[in-house]
Amino acid sequence: MLFPGCRSRALSSLCFCVLVLACVVACQQEGPGGTSSPPPEPASSSWSLVPGKVKEWMEPLVTRTRESWQWFWGPRAFQGFLQTYYDDHLRDLRSHTQAWLQSSKDSLLNKAYNLCPQLLCGDSSWD
């Protein structure tokens, strides 16, 4: 269960993690070109041709998409995104956390005081 008011921070953290993961996957280089796999054996059924056809159709699409989004994966764009994310979400995290802890403490003390019978607690202040 998330704390009240933390849902937007959790969503932004999740989006950030997904973006970093996508960047890492996109930036991985292919293995060395010297090792090539042997040619596939003749297919015994038409269903065994499906993976090759899917790869044949998808490779140009993936290549075009990678080339058109190359500017996004560059270091300047990613660095700008990280700086903006820090400024928007992480810079004042400490003060937000301290304020939340203080309000939680005050709320808990008020609830405890309200549950306490007047004979036991009296009129002393809770600090």
Swiss-Prot record:
Superkingdom, natural source: Eukaryota
Principal place of residence: secreted
Key words of the record: Lipid transport, Secreted, Signal, Transport
Signal sequence range: 1-27
Subcellular location(s) of the protein: Secreted
Pfam families on file: APOC4
GO cellular component: high-density lipoprotein particle; very-low-density lipoprotein particle
Annotated InterPro entries: APOC4
Gene Ontology biological process terms from the UniProt entry: lipid transport; positive regulation of triglyceride storage; triglyceride homeostasis
Purpose: May participate in lipoprotein metabolism.
Family statement drawn from the similarity comment of this UniProt entry: Belongs to the apolipoprotein C4 family.
Name the record gives this protein: Apolipoprotein C-IV
